[in-house]
Amino acid sequence: TLKMEDYQTIIHEASYISACSPVVNSSGQVVNGANNAPTSVYGINQDYMEIRKYSVGEGEMFTDQDIRRAAKVCVVGKTVVENLFTNGEDPLGKTIRFGKIPFKIIGVLTPKGYNSMGQDQDDLILAPYTTVQKRILAITYLQGIFASAISEEMSGEAIDELTAILRQNHKIKAGDDDDFNIRSQEELSSMLSSTTDLMTILLACIAGISLLV
């Protein structure tokens, strides 16, 4: 299992990593009045935007304070807006519900469209990872950690560094198997990649099963 300590160690000790975000996610129905649609909510920090090449087109991104407070705020993709605000209303400042949890929309993502795998990159909700952990999933661990290497050339070093950090944190003895998986963007692009920019080296440390969508 990946813990917050793993994330903290990576951001304090990893020299080949330029951005790093905890990741927890959940799929379910999102509701606004009489409108509802299936979608996924991703609990992340601000670095996730850089790693996955997302940007806020309207409104703003949530803050470190929102993360500390596990605030019920979110940034939504264009598809979510179209599904929930069918009359073209401005979604900013409106409250939607994911499961039983109300979220105030503070930002709308710049549309990215579909990726090469045919996945809609605008059908998602981004929220502070603490909010998704505590209020939706009721867990303290992380489902994944997304990171990007300082350059494509350094991706091998970044993977080696992450492996060493996690093995030490998890107290894995020499010769014993890892209890985590690390996938690079190259591997993911042939599996479950959700980004069209294959030049971005995305290193995902996934505990147990790969919860990568």
Roles of regions detected by a PLM:
Residues 1-40, 44-50, 83, 133-134, ...:
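Hydrophobic, regular-secondary-structure patches
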Residues 1, 15, 30-37, 108-114, ...:
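Structural beta->alpha junctions
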Residues 1-4, 43, 74-75, 126, ...:
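Short aromatic/basic micro-patch
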Residues 212:
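Glycine-rich active-site/cofactor-binding loop and its immediate structural neighborhood
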Residues 6-9, 80, 128-131, 141, ...:
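Hydrophobic alpha-helical segments typical of transmembrane helices
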Residues 47-62, 66, 71-175:
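Mid-to-C-terminal secondary-structure elements
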Residues 146, 154, 159-162, 173-209:
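Peri-transmembrane interface segments
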